[in-house]
Regions:
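Short, structured coil segments at secondary-structure junctions
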Residues: 25, 78-79, 99
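Structural motif
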Residues: 2-3, 59-63, 82-84, 101-105, ...
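Solvent-exposed alpha-helices and their adjacent loops that cap or buttress functional pockets
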Residues: 53-57, 96-98, 172-174
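N-terminal glycine-rich, Lys/His-bearing helix-loop that initiates the first secondary-structure elements
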Residues: 152-189
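Helix-adjacent hinge/juxtasegments
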Residues: 45-85
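Glycine-rich phosphate/diphosphate-binding loop of Rossmann-like nucleotide-binding domains
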Residues: 1-24, 29
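C-terminal binding/interaction regions
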Residues: 2-6, 10-13, 88-151
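A short beta-strand-loop structural module common to alpha/beta enzyme folds
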Residues: 28-39
């Protein structure tokens, strides 16, 4: 499994310990920075990690900042990213099993290295239950979240290009209201 990791200056002191846990579990780790405690903008590192996942160059990601909040907000702006701040091993385990969390967000300043290791281990070892019989509700809920994200992106188009938005909305309404039959002829010689 390939995991991209990123942090800001507040998460930098915790990053080495988290990387060690990831590697101990057999993960190939790509460290996207930052590389010291000089002040940086956390959205840059959230973007770098999330782009790797969205583009298929990483399977999952880890983000670390002081509280985790800013990184989680930035990460969840990306379609297909399910980032969660996990502050206990149980929340990390449930985040994976119920929500298929693909980006673990850690509050580097709020936990000692041992706790961060336990949280990371629980997230790594957890699996998504959505395909298991009787637990399909988890996959259904993720699809609902993805649909809401697509609607949100479509709404944004309404503000940025109302003419295109109106044309697409009219087409969707027409498709919903009618059955379109496509005729084709096949000839056999």
């Amino acid at each position: 499994m390939k995991i991209a990791i990123g942090c800001d200056h507040g998460g930098f002191p915790a990053k080495a310990a988290v990387i060690e846990v990831l590697r101990r579990h057999g993960a190939e780790v790509e460290d996207l920075g930052c590389h010291d405690t000089n002040s940086v903008d956390y959205p840059d590192y959230a973007r770098a990690v999330c782009e790797r996942i969205v583009e298929g160059r990483a399977d999952r990601g880890v983000l670390i900042c002081t509280t985790g909040t800013g990184m989680a907000i930035a990460a969840n702006r990306f379609s297909g990213i399910r980032a969660a701040v996990c502050d206990t091993p149980e929340r990390a385990r449930r985040g994976r099993s119920h929500n298929d969390v693909n980006v673990l967000v850690l509050a580097g300043a709020c936990h000692p290295a041992g706790e961060l290791a336990a949280i990371t281990t629980a997230w790594l070892e957890g699996g998504f239950e959505g395909a298991e019989p009787g637990k399909e509700r988890h996959a259904r809920r993720i699809e609902q979240i993805e649909r809401a994200g697509r609607r949100s992106e479509f709404a944004l188009l309404g503000r940025t290009d109302p003419e295109i938005h109106a044309a697409i909305a009219a087409h969707i309404a027409q498709e919903d209201a009618t059955i379109n039959l496509i005729a084709s002829e096949n000839y056999v010689s």
